[in-house]
Amino acid sequence: DIFCGETCAFIPCITHVPGTCSCKSKVCYFN
């Protein structure tokens, strides 16, 4: 797993593919 670079609601955003994410309304959205 890869930490995408943002923490949302104190939880690191984790994805299975490289990339970045944004935190909106305490939910991680992945590009």
From Swiss-Prot:
Keywords for the protein's UniProt record, in alphabetical order: Disulfide bond, Knottin, Plant defense
Keyword set includes Disulfide bond: yes
Post-translational events: This is a cyclic peptide.
Cross-link entry Cyclopeptide (Asp-Asn), positions: 1-31
S-S bonds: 4-21, 8-23, 13-28
Signal peptide positions on this chain: none
Pfam families per UniProt: Cyclotide
Tissue: Expressed in roots and runners but not in leaves, petals and petioles (at protein level).
InterPro entries attached to this UniProt entry: Cyclotide (IPR005535), Cyclotide_sf (IPR036146)
GO terms under biological process: defense response
Function: Probably participates in a plant defense mechanism.
Family: Belongs to the cyclotide family. Bracelet subfamily.
Domain notes per entry: The presence of a 'disulfide through disulfide knot' structurally defines this protein as a knottin.
Protein name: Cycloviolacin-O25
Organism for this UniProt entry: Viola odorata
